[in-house]
């Protein structure tokens, strides 16, 4: 069989067949063919994020890791094309590299030193209280300001914009849902906090009105009726928007490979 060049355009069926061959038979030739075809895609994304800087080759290498991961995890049953799945996977690896690079180069020493202390505090407080600690509890435990805790956690991509154990009304029948219900909970301690709090990174999928609903009912702990009164809409409308927002957040977390919540 003639090997396609990296500029060859494969049909969706051909891509799906090659991926199936690799996933089910560990066919390395199929993997090599896919890598050859999609190398240009990785190069293009690496160039976009390197912007001519010296670390372009580093981004290209981590982008290839993302491509290999996409080949390994892609499921055609989901319905989206391989390209639609691979692009955010590759970008996720690139952004993770840039995040780690920024952390190591630009983060002040005091923030780097506080990070391990926060991890220790979260582990101990979680054990003592059997729940994820709040920012103010971590600050009090470490005898530092809440601002320092937030700054450290934010720079480490693990700050708590939403209290993950805090419940909100899911419907007018009084049932409730927490963010942990949205993303699931398998981890304890710092890793659990670190992963669940990355929910903040997908809030952009919500409309302005949906963000208002989440802010009022979740962060400000207002009832659906109070929220409706503030926004000038019915409680039923609030309930519908809230369910829609929760669904969007759940789907965004599932689809975004950089979240690492699965």
UniProtKB/Swiss-Prot annotation:
Sorted UniProt keywords: DNA-binding, Sigma factor, Stress response, Transcription, Transcription regulation
Gene3D superfamilies: 1.20.120.1810, Winged helix-like DNA-binding domain superfamily/Winged helix DNA-binding domain
DNA-binding segment(s): 224-243
One Pfam family named in its UniProt record: Sigma70_r3
SUPFAM superfamilies: Sigma2 domain of RNA polymerase sigma factors, Sigma3 and sigma4 domains of RNA polymerase sigma factors
Motif segment (Polymerase core binding): 58-71
MF GO annotations: DNA binding; sigma factor activity
BP terms from Gene Ontology: DNA-templated transcription initiation; regulation of DNA-templated transcription
Description of what induces expression: By heat shock, salt stress, oxidative stress, glucose limitation, oxygen limitation and entry into stationary phase. Association with RNAP core increases during alcohol, NaOH, NaCl stress and during sporulation (at protein level).
Transmembrane segments: none
Keyword DNA-binding applies: yes
Xref: InterPro entries: RNA_pol_sigma-70_dom, RNA_pol_sigma-B, RNA_pol_sigma-B/F/G, RNA_pol_sigma70, RNA_pol_sigma70_r2, RNA_pol_sigma70_r3, RNA_pol_sigma70_r4, RNA_pol_sigma_r2
Family in the record: Belongs to the sigma-70 factor family. SigB subfamily.
Complex formation: Interacts transiently with the RNAP core.
Role played: Sigma factors are initiation factors that promote the attachment of RNA polymerase (RNAP) to specific initiation sites and are then released. Sigma B is not essential for sporulation; rather it is required for maximal expression of ctc and csbA which are transcribed in the early stationary phase under conditions inimical to sporulation. May play a role in the ability of the bacterium to adapt to various stresses but is not essential for its survival under these conditions. Positively regulates expression of its own operon.
Name of the protein in question: RNA polymerase sigma-B factor
């Amino acid at each position: 069989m003639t090997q396609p060049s990296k500029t060859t355009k494969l049909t969706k069926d051909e891509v799906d067949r090659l991926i199936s061959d690799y996933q089910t038979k560990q066919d390395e030739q199929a993997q090599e063919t896919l890598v050859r075809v999609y190398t240009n895609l990785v190069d293009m994304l690496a160039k976009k994020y390197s912007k001519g800087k010296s670390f372009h080759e580093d981004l290209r290498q981590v982008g290839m890791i993302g491509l290999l991961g996409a080949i390994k995890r892609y499921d055609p049953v989901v319905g989206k094309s391989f390209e639609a799945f691979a692009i955010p996977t590759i970008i996720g690896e690139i952004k993770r590299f840039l995040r780690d690079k920024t952390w190591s180069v630009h983060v002040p020493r005091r923030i780097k030193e506080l990070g391990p202390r926060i991890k220790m505090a979260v582990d101990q407080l979680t054990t003592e209280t059997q729940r994820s600690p709040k920012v103010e509890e971590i600050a009090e435990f470490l005898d530092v300001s809440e601002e320092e805790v937030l700054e450290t956690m934010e720079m480490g991509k693990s700050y708590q914009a939403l209290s993950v154990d805090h419940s909100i009304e899911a419907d007018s029948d009084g049932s409730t849902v927490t963010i942990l219900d949205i993303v699931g909970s398998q981890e304890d301690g710092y890793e659990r906090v670190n992963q669940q709090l990355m929910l903040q990174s997908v809030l952009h999928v919500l409309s302005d009105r949906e963000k208002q609903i989440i802010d009022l009912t979740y962060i400000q702990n207002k009832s659906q009726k109070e929220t409706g009164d503030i926004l000038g809409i019915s409680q039923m409308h609030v309930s519908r928007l809230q369910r829609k927002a929760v669904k969007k957040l759940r789907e965004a977390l599932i689809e975004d490979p950089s979240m690492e919540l699965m």
